[in-house]
């Protein structure tokens, strides 16, 4: 990491400002070469914005603010310089070119954060949280990413690792001093601790919650043709996303939209009406609808309460058994024929909500239901699929160690415990291969 890197840190296109970031030993030399402070002189004070001009020889390139953050009190723990320029691709590209011609090289994706990790300012789980924070679409995801960035996952894993080290020390003592600690005594003392640690880690592995934070809740609206699915989708989204007509079978393909409720991201999919049809195009739509239902986290079965329950409706109700979802009685603004009491037996304990797509206030219970399905505990510790996979490997190794220890094979249990330790170290990056680092930081944008 002896070389100095530079990149544009803001999104391309026109904007209020553009930022060019430089990190490395030559950062201050580059600052001196291309920045002329107004009413001041070099060296600039650290961590203070200074007004001046970017220059190329005697030519003024832009009026800007510049700041130097001297090591180790910077994002990368190296000397870091940032130029805050007028927004626009031309200016930023010119300033970047000046930095490169002055001795820096173009940064790779995620290289600034990678240096923060390699220089010990953050661990790998915190580095990944930076990407999660950038990618967060909802308040719930932002909060989870911020907890991880401030060390939530790190402290949990390090506490688990400390307990594991203590258990390993007990195993080592039994192996080194068998005359003082028998294998039976070691098993009696250590096996319960291993089991407790395995449970603690397993309880933190909530794949569904982690996926909700990463991708949002997938909701599919299903039902027979002309029950108001498309109208309901439009009403929930607050826009005319799907075409609505009185003709059954208007929706033939999937129509998707995204809704934000209580800080959670919810992806809605309106599907073609589920029924038998000889129309080949409509049949394709029905097949796609069934696939969307299979992939959904929540299924909303929409029924028209202004008409009686049909045999096809009853078939859909039976298909909903065992799935996560609710029954939506639509068209409550019309004279009711079908009521909640008519569906109590067929509902299989699922919520029954009465709404009208044409009456916005009636949608609040449905929105509350969807928000509850998308909610994730504020106490969630592991939010990255990679972390959960590593923790599950640690749990499996701990279970094996417990079983081996209870068989009084202390030395073999030590091998299993070492496997668990390596899995935990993968999460924080204490033990990690270069290939994994390339994969993690390759997901970042250039300039971060």
Name these PLM-found stretches.
Residues 50-62, 66-70, 249-277, 295-298:
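Switch I (G2) and immediately adjacent beta-strands of P-loop GTPase domains
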Residues 237, 272-273, 297, 304-305, ...:
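Short glycine-/small-residue-rich Rossmann-like dinucleotide-binding loops
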């Amino acid at each position: 990491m002896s070389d100095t890197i530079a990149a544009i840190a803001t999104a391309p296109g026109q904007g209020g400002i553009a930022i060019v970031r430089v990190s490395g030993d030559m950062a201050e030399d580059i600052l001196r070469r291309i920045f002329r402070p107004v009413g001041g002189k070099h060296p600039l004070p650290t961590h203070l914005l200074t007004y001046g001009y970017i220059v190329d020889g005697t030519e003024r390139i832009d009026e800007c603010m510049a700041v130097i953050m001297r090591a180790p009190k910077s994002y990368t723990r190296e000397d870091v310089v940032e130029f805050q320029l007028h927004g626009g691709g031309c200016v930023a590209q010119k300033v970047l070119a000046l930095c490169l011609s002055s001795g820096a090289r173009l940064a790779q994706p995620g290289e600034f954060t990678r240096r923060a990790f390699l220089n010990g300012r953050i661990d790998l789980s915190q580095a990944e949280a930076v990407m999660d924070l950038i990618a967060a679409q909802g308040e719930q995801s932002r909060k989870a990413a911020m907890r991880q960035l401030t060390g939530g996952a790190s402290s949990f894993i390090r506490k688990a690792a400390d307990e594991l080290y203590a258990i390993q020390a007990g195993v080592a003592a039994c192996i080194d001093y068998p005359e003082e600690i028998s294998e039976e005594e070691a098993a009696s003392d250590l096996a319960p601790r291993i089991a407790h640690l395995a449970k603690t880690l397993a309880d933190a592995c909530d794949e569904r919650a982690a996926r909700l934070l990463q991708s949002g809740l997938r909701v599919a609206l299903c039902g027979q043709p002309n029950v108001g699915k498309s109208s309901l989708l439009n009403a929930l989204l607050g826009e005319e996303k799907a075409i609505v007509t009185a003709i059954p079978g208007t929706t033939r393909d999937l129509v998707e939209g995204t809704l934000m409720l209580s800080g959670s991201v919810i992806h809605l999919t309106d599907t073609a009406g589920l029924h038998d049809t000889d129309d080949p195009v409509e049949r394709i739509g029905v097949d796609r609808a069934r696939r969307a239902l299979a992939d959904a986290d929540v299924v909303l079965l929409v029924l028209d309460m202004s008409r009686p329950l049909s045999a096809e409706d009853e078939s859909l109700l039976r298909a909903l058994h065992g799935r996560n979802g609710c029954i939506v009685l639509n068209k409550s603004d019309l004279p009711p024929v079908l009521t909640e009491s008519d569906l109590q037996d067929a509902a299989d304990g699922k919520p029954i909500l009465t709404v009208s797509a044409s009456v916005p206030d009636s949608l609040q219970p449905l929105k509350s239901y969807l928000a509850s399905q998308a909610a994730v505990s504020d106490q969630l510790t592991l939010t990255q699929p990679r972390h959960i996979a590593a923790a599950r490997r640690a749990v499996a190794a701990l279970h094996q160690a417990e079983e081996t220890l209870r068989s009084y094979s202390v030395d073999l249990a030590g091998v299993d415990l070492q496997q668990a330790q390596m899995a935990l170290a993968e999460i924080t990056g204490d033990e990690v291969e270069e290939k994994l680092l390339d994969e993690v930081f390759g997901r970042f944008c250039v300039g971060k």
